């Protein structure tokens, strides 16, 4: 009888164990974390913006797959128009001020030109000493003003991420380079009689940042006159009219064109309208804008998502402690030339199409 009772107890215990196994299996296993400060990710725009969202998702996936233990926290600058640029510096200071003591970030990641500019405009210990990584930014940048400023007449100095911010703890990043020299040389190879460069930029941080860079670089070419078609002070129609009246021996270098002085976003086909304002003008691009339907070509960055790369380098730096294997990386650019002679009535010297050093960009008409 005692043996039967013992067997019954064992059987009941076994059945209880069998019943509990599915419950245990369904319980989530908590990922291993660290008590160190979080990874603070500051974005220029709302995280739901596609470019930001894609990079954030790629970062999260890569960092988690590698077994990262630090907790990412996302803050947004919610940057809008260039006219509010003077607010970005204080907005960044407010974000950084929320993370003190034990909550101080182990790493700050900046995604977007505006967030990066606001960060390098800080003169605080947390900004300068905390390790930082940047993405979706260019080599050239601007330091923001302290006070309200009329951005229509603001002429900031172009800064270089490699040479001007040695007092910041920039441990890694993926940056694009807008190479003015290579574009001017390319334009001269096509049009050796070029006497003027008309540069088009819009009423955005990116447009002003490019304009500041071009102003800095054009000092190397005193024999060339520079004409500024500036969306900060001109409407789309005013720029279009000036395009009609540009003098001979002028080549256009296209920066970016999304917002004019009315702070209204222009629709995509406005570049077609600018093209039609003076279809015989030779146009080159420094940022891929206009390729395929207007610009003959240019030396431009190879834009691509960097979230996965940042996730990998973050894991190496924080979790593996690999401080030697991470660094700033300039994403290589490329020459892109429209492989379609006689397009838009612009004469392209035949000899240039025999040059093996030029990479061709196939002509693909875009819908208007």
Model-derived features with residue positions:
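Bacterial N-terminal signal peptides that target proteins for export
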Residues: 1-15
